[in-house]
Amino acid sequence: CIGMDRAAFKELMGPFEVFRNAHSKEQNQLGQEQTDCPKLDLANYEYRRVLGVGGFGLVSLYARKSDGELFALKKMQKALIVQEEMQKFVRQEKLFLAELSGNSFVPILDGSAQDDDSVYLMLEFLSGGDLFSLIEQYGALDESTVVRFTAACTILGLQHVHKHSIAFRDLKLENLVIDSKGYVKLVDFGLAKRILARSYTFCGSPRYCAPEMVTGKGHNKGVDWWALGVVLFETLFAMSPFDDNCDDVELFRRIANEPLEFPGYPQLQPNCTDFITQLLNKDSTKRLGALADGSDGCMKHAWFSDMNWGDLRAQTLKSPIVPTPYKQSEDKSASDAVEVPEMHSVLTKYRQSTDPQAGWTDAF
C-alpha cells in the first residue's frame, strides 16, 4: 500500500476535484451503459454460416429477419474466458461498444446476451476484412488514395472514442476492419480503458506500443496517435518502423531511443511523411493528436487539405477501397457446433468451480 498526501496526489494525477468529478461521471456512465444495448433474441435472426474461430469461441454470420441486414455473432465460452482471466476485458468490451455504438467508425452492437456457458455479442458484419489481410494480398498500399482515406477514417474513429475519455490502446492493422462500403472501422475494445489522467498498465501489441508505455512513464490517449503512425508506416511500406523480427527487448529499445527513418522507396509526399513523423514523436507532450487541439490538429494537417471531413463523417465519399461483396451462395450448412480445442474438459472444470470474478456477466 502506498501512502500519498494531497500535494503528491495533485502532482501525479492532477487536481483532486477534477479526478473525483471525472470518476463520478465514469461510474454514472457505466451504470447507464448496461441499459443502452438491447437484449439479444436469436429468434429474430437467421443463421447463415460460421465465419471463424475467435480467441474464446466462434464468430458466425446471421441475418436479421426484419430487414436482412447481416451481423456477426461473437459467441464466447465463459470457461475459456475465466481460464485466461479475461472476465474484466470481455465485460468492458461490451460496455464500451454499447456506449460507442452508433458512430460510423465503430461497429454497431445490435444486442448482447448470455446463457449458462457463453456470452454473446451481435455485431455489425464487416465484410471487407482487415488491413493486415489487405497488405498481405496487395503489399504496400497507395499513399494518396487508400492510406490517406484509411488515416482519415481512423482519425474520426479515435476522435469519437477519445470524446468519451476512452483510450483504445490496441490500434493495429488487424483491428482496422473494412465495411461493405470500403470504410474503415475500429474493432476489438477488449484493451480499451477510460483514462482520466494516466495509466501505468502495459498492454497492446509490442510493435505498436508508444515510448511512454515501454518506459513505464505512464500513458494516456496519446498512445493511440503513436499507434496510428505505426499503422500508416506499415500500410505504406509493408514493414514496421522499428521491428525487423528482433526480440521484444530490442524492439522496445528502438521504440524508446532510435530515430524514425523512412525507406527510400516509395517516395512519399512531404506532407505525408511530416504527418507520420509528428504522430511518431517520442515526446507525448509534443505528439500530433495528443496536443491541446486533439484530433482537430490531425484533421487540419496539410496532408488532408482537400479532405471533406463532413462528407467522410456522413460516409458519402466514395472509398478507394473496394471490398469483395458478400455472396449468399457462399453460406455453408455447417452448424455452430464446431469443436473448440479442449473445450469439454475446460467447460467441465468451469461448471464445477466458483468464478473468482462473479458478476462480470451482469453486463450481458
Language-model region placement:
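Protein kinase glycine-rich loop
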Residues: 48-59
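Glycine-rich ATP phosphate-binding loop
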Residues: 58-80
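Short beta-strand micro-motifs within the conserved protein kinase catalytic domain, predominantly
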Residues: 108-117
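Conserved short submotifs of the Hanks-type protein kinase catalytic core
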Residues: 116-130
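Activation segment signature within eukaryotic-like protein kinase domains
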Residues: 150-151
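Eukaryotic Ser/Thr kinase distal regulatory-tail detector
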Residues: 272, 313-364
